[in-house]
């Protein structure tokens, strides 16, 4: 017997949960978007779909892993991160501003330093240079300038005439003691390393024509470090101060560095002689400044066959010398390159022989120092010992200055040639 639609609806309502009665908007999950066939219009019992729909959404939301705290706490956390980011941005902006201020300050300091250097140079070449330099040094005493080389070295303006820095040395007669014909030699300050311990500062002096000298109290000599004036001294630093360059310089081999290092490690003349016999004819190259110099190892035994061997012993005040190698095409003079033989004596001192005069000139205290300083001391136009011009016999020929710092403008040379004679 067929059931009426009302009975069918009642049976369905008794067996199916109330919140899952199918309708157009309440679709079971297995339909996947496909709606079930609708009931006849005569069925009046329908439940609102939002009950089961809400429960299914609640069940699906229960699988999400929410962090501890409510949604408002999450919003507050995001606001805190934004505030932290803003604080970091403000810190970066403050640092950038401080860097810009520091750069502006450095730029201003550099500009003032350049102006002071230029003023010092102008005072050193005036007609009354001594008086102008004294006034300037007393006015800016204590001012510090940074040197380009070595790193960490500074020049400090200082009135050494008042502090009596030289002690036993007569400051007022320096030009007569060390130089040839300069009219004045005035101390203007000192150079020293930052936070140096056990190293006294080196006095800096300016002579006629603006030339800059450094006084070495160890060997009691003056070293010409800049012929171009005070500006060149600040720009080049102490590169032309041979003792410091021999101590702090570096060796750069181009080719055959193993051969050059073997010579650097040799401790005495016997080891050098054996090395020369072993490496005879070997070639290596190294750099002296911007020049790459080619060096050929010689047979040490040929030293004693050279007619100038006896003169080399006298000129260098040595008991024995050994000719170890020859350096090709050395640019020691303008528009001229020379092949210079290298000698080493029993104490390790290195000398270079001029190929035309056959005279030996002191170069360095050892082969390591020679590869660092190169031919800076060759023909000795940079180092001036006490009384080297007034009493040249007091200095060994290999260490003696060979020319006046004024070079072609030497007053003694011009007087000797009769250039001052009246016509």
UniProtKB/Swiss-Prot annotation:
Ranges annotated as spanning the membrane: none
Gene Ontology cellular-component terms listed: viral tegument
Localization: Virion tegument
Record has Cell cycle as a keyword: no
Domain of life of the organism encoding this protein: Viruses
A Pfam match: US22
Compositionally biased region (Polar residues): 1-12
UniProt keyword annotations, A-Z: Virion, Virion tegument
Name of the protein in question: Tegument protein UL43
Species this chain originates from: Human cytomegalovirus (strain AD169) (HHV-5)
Species lineage: Viruses, Duplodnaviria, Heunggongvirae, Peploviricota, Herviviricetes
